[in-house]
């Protein structure tokens, strides 16, 4: 017997007759009152709900005047409208503050907005005024600040757009001319200046300034950040400071942490995501600042996804949320920036999907999905080449190189997981090793040939770490049958020369330098280590790699 189809066609819901016509089983014209009830001068009621029946009967149960008739119909209409409200209405974002605010509005109490209360606190509290003045006294001269702000915009806004340079430059000019600038804007501008001070290269006027004073750019950056934190941790400021401004501040700092810090957690990214998701979900706002907030949220998602793709860190933001929000990015007047972020979003979404699939699929399931991801990535690469390869401009050239670096990194991540499992479990294991080796070679050559460009835009340290890890992948592939090109080790020599030139302090960079020494003489006896490398002479290649890349953040939420 054939079962009934579950997908039944929905019947058209017909208007029902009034209650009296239904009882009498006669035809009803379904008006109010219907013709039959009107003719018999009886009350006409419809059984939509009992409350509506009572409301409709009430005016007919007492003498009707013009006043009572109009008021009764108005009351009936109002109460019926209330009953017809959608039953699927959802709560908004509810916390203690919104509950108190709603209660106050119900009682007729007019509450002042946090910005006016913050303004009053800054004007009346001498301690807060002094802290803010101390921050302004610490910044460099105005011409140096203007140059640093331009350095920030030229370096960071090319990749992640968080702070509007033209608006920030105007506010800095107002500060210079002693015009009033609100504290939130001052703190964001000074934060951007502090981040710019942490970069490696500066224009000549900034270099001259620091050669004439008794502190370095890094020391000044640390001092500014410390004073900003002290100011924001004041109880009144912490309570009244707008969450969107706090999110912007941590997002600005997170950009720098992503590029310069390797073995420590990006706590500013953690703060920004925590505030954006839990304290004040900016992607749910529908006010006039929605578009600006959405741009900040998308930039935070990009930073989070870049850390996952470039460093194989567990992402904070779920990849499907980021993918859904990408379509809400506005094109605006800068078409090149829109195209860049659109292509970057496609690459990062694919990279996040690969990361999730590696950790949730079986080996065979993931092998079967490789061709799908390869075709996705190939389509994105074709778009990158068509839209960025033949356009002049240093910013555009950097974006082209950056997109290709992310592309080859995502492709490397697609294959590199297979070197952790037995070759007997993987169909076509030699082919996968071959693809992994070729992809890693392409990525290494690209980074090696683009060192100057990456340094100009503040990405050199991150790329040096990435290429060092890629060298390890190539070495493993060579042990499993991949023939490394004879001229490839010139690439390692080029990277090693860059490290020797920069002389970055710290044990991590010393160990990376040691690894590169081994790479450049991979077919010869292990070279003797210089005195600068101390206790590294008794450690083999993989022990050193363990020291460099063995870290675990465990993703704790910071104390808020």
From Swiss-Prot:
InterPro entries: Sec_Metabolite_Reg, Zn2-C6_fun-type_DNA-bd_sf, Zn2Cys6_DnaBD. Residues 60-80 are annotated as: Disordered. Keywords: DNA-binding, Membrane, Metal-binding, Nucleus, Transcription, Transcription regulation, Transmembrane, Transmembrane helix, Zinc. Its main location: nucleus. PROSITE patterns: ZN2_CY6_FUNGAL_1, ZN2_CY6_FUNGAL_2. Residues 64-80 have a biased composition (Basic and acidic residues). It is a single-pass membrane protein. SMART domains: GAL4. This is Uncharacterized transcriptional regulatory protein C16G5.17. One of its GO terms (cellular component) is nuclear membrane. It comes from Schizosaccharomyces pombe (strain 972 / ATCC 24843) (Fission yeast). It is found in: Nucleus membrane.
């Amino acid at each position: 017997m054939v079962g009934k189809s579950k997908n039944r066609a929905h019947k058209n819901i017909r208007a029902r007759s009034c209650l009296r016509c239904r009882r009498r089983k006669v035809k009803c014209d379904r008006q109010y009152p219907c013709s039959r009830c009107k003719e018999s001068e009886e009350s006409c009621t419809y059984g939509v709900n009992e409350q509506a029946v009572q409301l409709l009967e009430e005016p007919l149960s007492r003498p009707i005047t013009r006043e009572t008739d109009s008021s009764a119909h108005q009351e009936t209409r109002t109460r019926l409208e209330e009953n017809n409200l959608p039953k699927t209405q959802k709560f908004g974002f509810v916390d203690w503050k919104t509950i108190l605010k709603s209660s106050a509005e119900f009682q007729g109490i007019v509450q002042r907005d946090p910005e006016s209360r913050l303004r009053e606190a800054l004007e009346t509290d001498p301690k807060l005024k002094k802290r803010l003045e101390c921050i302004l006294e610490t910044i460099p001269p105005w011409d140096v600040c203007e140059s640093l702000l331009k350095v920030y915009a030229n370096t960071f806004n090319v990749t992640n757009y968080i702070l509007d340079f033209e608006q920030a430059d105007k506010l800095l000019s107002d500060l210079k001319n002693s015009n009033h600038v609100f504290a939130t804007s001052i703190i964001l501008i000074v934060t951007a200046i502090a981040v710019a001070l942490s970069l490696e290269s500066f224009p000549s006027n900034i270099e001259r300034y620091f050669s004439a004073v008794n502190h370095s750019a890094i020391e000044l950056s640390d001092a500014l950040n410390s004073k900003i934190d002290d100011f924001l941790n004041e109880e009144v400021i912490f309570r009244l400071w707008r969450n969107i401004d706090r999110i912007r501040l941590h997002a600005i700092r997170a950009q720098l942490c992503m590029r310069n810090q390797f073995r420590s957690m990006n706590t500013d990214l953690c703060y920004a995501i925590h505030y954006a998701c839990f304290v004040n979900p900016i992607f749910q706002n529908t006010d006039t600042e929605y578009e600006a907030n959405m741009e900040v949220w998308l930039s935070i998602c990009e930073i989070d996804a870049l850390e996952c793709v470039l460093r194989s860190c567990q992402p904070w933001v779920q990849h499907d949320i980021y993918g859904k929000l990408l379509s809400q990015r506005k094109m605006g007047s800068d078409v090149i920036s829109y195209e860049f972020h659109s292509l970057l979003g496609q690459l990062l979404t694919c990279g996040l999907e690969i990361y999730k699939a590696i950790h949730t699929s079986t080996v065979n399931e993931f092998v079967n999905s490789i061709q799908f991801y390869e075709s996705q990535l190939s389509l994105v690469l074709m778009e990158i080449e068509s839209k960025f390869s033949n356009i002049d401009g240093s910013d555009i050239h950097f974006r082209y190189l950056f997109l290709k670096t992310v592309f080859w990194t995502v492709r490397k991540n697609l294959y590199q997981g297979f070197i952790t499992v037995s070759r007997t479990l993987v169909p076509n294991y030699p082919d996968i090793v071959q693809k992994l080796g070729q992809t890693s070679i392409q990525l290494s050559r690209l980074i090696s040939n683009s060192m100057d460009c990456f340094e100009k835009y503040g990405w050199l340290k991150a790329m040096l770490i990435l290429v060092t890890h890629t060298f390890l992948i190539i070495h493993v592939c060579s042990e499993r049958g991949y023939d490394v090109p004879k001229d490839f080790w010139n690439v390692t020599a080029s990277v090693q020369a860059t490290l020797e030139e920069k002389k970055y302090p710290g044990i991590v960079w010393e160990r990376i330098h040691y690894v590169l020494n081994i790479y450049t003489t991979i077919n010869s006896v292990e070279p003797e280590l210089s005195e600068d490398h101390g206790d590294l002479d008794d450690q083999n290649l993989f022990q050193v790699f363990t020291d460099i890349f063995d870290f675990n953040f465990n993703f704790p939420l910071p104390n808020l």
